[in-house]
């Protein structure tokens, strides 16, 4: 068990309505430039804070693979799916480095606020490369270490955006870019060219 992993017993915090003030799903969607019909792997999906908005955005021809290593949070996400009548979210109980997804099945491999928890980041990026179709993108959103820790993990656990960018380049992703999203987060993206 990863000691940095967000505890499933605290999953209610993932659905705190105040969260929208500092990380609005609409801002994340705009930054990612998703399109209708796209297939997205939301890795570390948790209770679906972003999975459900992604599902609505990509529409019925799109697909969201909501991947999480904790069955408890996926159970909570399933309840939300049932209540919202969303039909294009598929739950996957798996680790980020072994999602079990088919090769070249996704246009976006997305992770929000889990990068600092991942012990074997290079293995996760290798999995992203396997799962992404040519031209697909990996996107990592995580906590900035240069802001007061009102929310999120301790500053000592946070990762600087430059390290994430370096990891993307080392893993073979091209055209890596970064931006700030919300009050407390950075987002990096890179493209699989082949």
Task: Give a label for each model feature.
Residues 58-59, 118-119, 132-134:
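Helix-to-beta-strand junctions that scaffold the AdoMet/dcAdoMet cofactor pocket
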Residues 122-137:
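A short glycine-rich, Lys/Arg-flanked "PGG" loop and its adjoining helix->strand segment in the class I
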């Amino acid at each position: 068990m990863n000691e940095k992993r967000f505890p499933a017993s605290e999953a209610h915090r993932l659905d705190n309505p105040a969260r929208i003030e500092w990380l609005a799903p609409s801002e994340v969607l705009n930054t990612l430039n998703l399109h209708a019909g796209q297939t997205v792997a939301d890795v570390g999906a948790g209770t679906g804070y972003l999975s459900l908005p992604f599902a609505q955005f990509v529409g019925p021809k799109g697909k969201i693979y909501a991947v999480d290593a904790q069955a408890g949070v996926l159970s909570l996400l399933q309840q939300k799916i049932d209540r919202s009548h969303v039909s294009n979210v598929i739950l996957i109980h798996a680790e980020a480095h072994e999602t079990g997804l088919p090769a070249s099945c996704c246009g976006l491999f997305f992770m929000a606020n889990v990068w600092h928890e991942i012990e074997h980041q290079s293995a996760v990026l290798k999995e992203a490369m396997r799962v992404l179709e040519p031209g697909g993108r990996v996107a990592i959103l995580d906590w900035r270490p240069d802001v007061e820790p009102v929310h999120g993990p301790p500053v000592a656990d946070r990762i600087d955006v430059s390290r994430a960018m370096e990891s993307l380049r080392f893993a073979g992703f091209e055209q890596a870019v970064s931006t700030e999203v919300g009050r407390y987060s950075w987002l990096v993206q890179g493209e699989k060219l082949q």
